[in-house]
Design a protein with these regions (language model features):
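Acidic, surface-exposed loops and disordered segments
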Residues: 1-176
Length: 176
């Protein structure tokens, strides 16, 4: 039972990290993270994701100029772009790739690395062009990845009684 509790504690301990140490992430750790991500669930086991590792400083700067909230990329040793094949999973590619993205974030956290999810379907065509992605691959997520140089406090989360409904919306399960 304690293993389950430890896993739940692990889940709630993850934070978005926006400041990183000037220390490279070894390639074997990057590959371990991406190896875990490929086991994320996807509709009909379509696995519509591809991962682009971006280490080039100039390329990270170019992404930073394209995307409004990409400043954490500039201080991170690398970025991982999750590109989704919308043809492989036309009705659920966004959810599928969100699953893979979360697996990346959790695997990185398990290895002591920090991440922050930057991309949210903004400037898709510009990022596709910059990374030479074919039209069918949509950059769903850009993650800054590195060794944390901050320890953010937990942000306020809504109480369960505010978000859990029973049988139909508006019938709060945990009403006070």
């Amino acid at each position: 039972m304690s293993g389950r509790c430890n896993f739940l504690q692990f889940l709630v301990s993850r934070r978005s990290i926006r400041k990183f140490k000037d220390k490279p992430v070894p390639d074997d750790l990057i590959l371990r993270i991406l190896d875990a991500a490929r086991f994320a669930p996807s509709a009909k086991n379509s696995q519509p994701w591809e991962f682009i590792i971006v280490k080039d400083r100039i390329l990270k700067e170019k992404i930073g100029k394209i995307h409004k909230w990409a400043s954490p990329l500039l201080g991170a040793p690398l970025a991982i772009v999750v590109a989704c094949n919308r043809e492989a999973s036309p009705t659920s590619y966004l959810v599928d790739c969100a699953n893979a993205t979360m697996y990346i974030m959790l695997a990185a956290h398990a290895l002591g690395l920090g991440t922050v999810w930057i991309q949210s379907l903004r400037n898709v065509e510009e990022i596709q062009e910059l990374l030479k992605l074919p039209e069918k691959l949509i950059p769903v997520a850009i993650l800054a990845v590195g060794w944390p140089d901050e320890s953010p406090s937990p942000k306020r989360r809504k109480e369960l009684k505010e978000i859990v409904h029973l049988d139909k919306y508006g019938r709060y399960w945990m009403s006070t």
